[in-house]
């Protein structure tokens, strides 16, 4: 995507009237490599001008915000480093196809003896771009078609239309994205969408039509998102054999909710990390901004990763959540938590743990799940340093529970109920990392603590997705 170029690495004199008259004699000055490196690192320079070649519809103010640190560089090494950082910021805006950097001595009447010019050669994206790709969700694959209008108003705004057709879900949506100049992490977006999903474990079909507005911003080492969402939900039965409990949930509802999400992520990879930690906390309040659905919902996700000897990695994760209905109306099957499957408690079928009626799983209002994992290289290290590095041997122990609580009881009763009838499983398998997109797991699972009504997958189980317990 481009490189940083320096026209000359010869030492730059800091003063002297003969700077412009050295002529060709400078080509014959020999400098020892060690001394030359020392001079480059310590030589004081001044960035006098920053030029842009290739700008069209991009506004100057957003560019100035991204390259301002280049002027603060005090030596050539700093100039190269800050120019590279500025290049990465420009690419992150998503409005350039390519960005190259050229560093040269300053030219012109106002040139200082130690002055430098930095030139960014950019290629803007076309006004309309299209894309076609496949995407892997949690045990679901989909085909995605997209149209994008990048840099719509010249300040990195983006309008995107996306259509997705998957094995269980079909959706299309229109979104507008606007970053804050000079601080890409602070951004605002508006979305219009329609999503139709099938949930065979509940014999349920759900169609959502809605809109949302969200604002994302960082605070210290945390990322926050504040969101409002209004959605018209239509629930129906997926088959004639759906239970009465599911049929009773069928119909229309309107949900208007405010939510907040906080993320702290120090992992080196989101797909198969070797080190670092993750903490996600989500809160949602529905009903106070309209609609006929009212509840408070809290859930969190914690993950710790530690690299061990022999290139092994130990990972521990813990999930939990609680849904409290507000008023006399019970919670909806569309808002409850679900547990079980190759991406959560392995050895059980997808979302097939907890309350159920006539074989249809209804979800629960409280849950917890934990996992311990050991990832090691493949035995005898086939393909070491190449394709074989994408595979890892996987040993795991999972446990958890999903239930409904009587909120008239105290916290001790809630904890006691969550500690009853714990489902757990153990096993081993192979993990394949698909770049930074998704991961595949093929495990041999032994489910334990099975309760009446649970649906198990005893033996080989395949999982694909981006979020795993």
From Swiss-Prot:
Entry's Gene Ontology cellular component terms: extracellular exosome; membrane; MIB complex; mitochondrial outer membrane; mitochondrion; SAM complex
InterPro entries named in the record: Bac_surfAg_D15, D15-like, POTRA
Record domain POTRA: where: 45-125
Sites bearing N6-methyllysine, chain numbering: 255
Membrane-related topology note: Multi-pass membrane protein
Subcellular location: Mitochondrion outer membrane; Cytoplasm; Mitochondrion
Renumbered residue ranges of the record's region Disordered: 1-20
Keywords for the protein's UniProt record, in alphabetical order: Cytoplasm, Membrane, Methylation, Mitochondrion, Mitochondrion outer membrane, Transmembrane, Transmembrane beta strand
GO process terms (BP): cristae formation; inner mitochondrial membrane organization; mitochondrial respiratory chain complex assembly; protein import into mitochondrial matrix; protein insertion into mitochondrial outer membrane
A Pfam family recorded for this sequence: Omp85
Domain-related comment: Its C-terminal part seems to contain many membrane-spanning sided beta-sheets, that have the potential to adopt a transmembrane beta-barrel type structure.
Protein's job: Plays a crucial role in the maintenance of the structure of mitochondrial cristae and the proper assembly of the mitochondrial respiratory chain complexes. Required for the assembly of TOMM40 into the TOM complex.
Subunit-level organization: Associates with the mitochondrial contact site and cristae organizing system (MICOS) complex, composed of at least MICOS10/MIC10, CHCHD3/MIC19, CHCHD6/MIC25, APOOL/MIC27, IMMT/MIC60, APOO/MIC23/MIC26 and QIL1/MIC13. This complex was also known under the names MINOS or MitOS complex. The MICOS complex associates with mitochondrial outer membrane proteins SAMM50, MTX1 and MTX2 (together described as components of the mitochondrial outer membrane sorting assembly machinery (SAM) complex) and DNAJC11, mitochondrial inner membrane protein TMEM11 and with HSPA9. (Microbial infection) Interacts with parasite T.gondii RH strain MAF1b1; the interaction is probably indirect and results in the disruption of the MIB complex and the formation of SPOTs (structures positive for outer mitochondrial membrane (OMM)), a cellular response to OMM stress, which leads to the constitutive shedding of OMM vesicles.
Homology family: Belongs to the SAM50/omp85 family.
Name by which UniProt lists this protein: Sorting and assembly machinery component 50 homolog
Source organism (scientific name): Homo sapiens
